[in-house]
Regions:
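ABC ATPase nucleotide-binding domains
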Residues: 183-217
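Conserved ABC ATPase signature
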Residues: 97-101, 105
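Conserved ABC transporter NBD signature motif
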Residues: 22-38
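H-loop (His-switch) and adjacent beta-strand-loop-beta switch element
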Residues: 167-182, 200
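Catalytic Walker B motif of ABC-type/P-loop ATPase nucleotide-binding domains
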Residues: 122-126
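Conserved ABC ATPase "signature" region
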Residues: 75-93
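Helix-to-loop junction immediately C-terminal to a conserved catalytic motif
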Residues: 14
Length: 217
């Protein structure tokens, strides 16, 4: 739900915020490690689309941590940027300013920035916001391919779509409740979304909708 703490939790995992209590631990293949490499796609509405930067420069900025101070990017790094832009389906738009992009093009640009460094984990904060359903299907197909190379943590309010495209879910609403698969009941959803849920079926596609309910005054 809104205000449940999802984005805050992601920023703590990324090291952008410090936890007020407790600590963050990372594990790789069952063993605790000091850190892991991560890519991050922030919420769409946090991006300043008037900032004078091109598609190429945005994706290239994803390699900043791999570049020595006062040194130029290497040929191999520029090759990686071009490869990532092609993978995102953005060829021909390399020099276009982000303010001239459609919602889907901007999301793919930001996703390219998150992926160009070959991270072990990619965190996507509501990646399907402001994109149409046609591109949403392409986005999830692309994420399925990316998931073969790294882990993906995806934040979304769209429970109906999410359950068709993920392997496990966690509900964050003040506290975190992890569910190891996507076979969840209406009762589980109601308990965590704090409103009535009805499960419907249509062919092989599951749909989840809200029942009629009254808001408290």
């Amino acid at each position: 739900p809104n205000g449940g703490g999802k984005t805050t939790l992601m920023k703590i995992i990324l090291g952008l915020l410090k936890p007020s209590a407790g600590k963050i631990q990372f594990f790789h293949q069952g063993k605790e490690v000091n850190e892991i490499t991560m890519g991050y796609l922030p919420q769409y509405n946090t991006i300043d689309k008037k900032f004078p930067i091109s598609v190429y420069e945005v994706v290239l900025s994803g390699l900043n941590k791999q570049k020595s101070l006062f040194c130029s990017f290497s040929k191999a790094q520029h090759d990686k940027v071009r490869e990532t832009i092609a993978r995102m389906g953005l060829e021909g738009l390399e020099q276009r300013a982000i303010g001239q992009l459609s919602g889907g093009q901007l999301q793919r640009t930001l996703l390219g920035r998150a992926l160009v460094s070959n991270p072990e984990v990619v965190i996507l904060d509501e990646p399907n916001t402001y994109i149409d359903k046609r591109f949403e299907a392409r986005l999830y197909a692309l994420l399925e391919e990316i998931n073969k190379e790294c882990a993906i943590v995806l934040v979304s309010h769209d429970i109906g779509t999410i359950l068709q495209n993920v392997k496990s879910i966690a509900c964050v609403n003040g506290t975190l409740d992890y569910h190891p698969d996507t076979e969840v009941s209406a009762e589980w959803l109601e308990a965590h979304f704090e409103c009535p849920i009805e499960l419907l079926g249509h062919g092989n596609l599951p749909h989840r909708i809200l029942k009629c309910h009254h808001h408290e005054e």
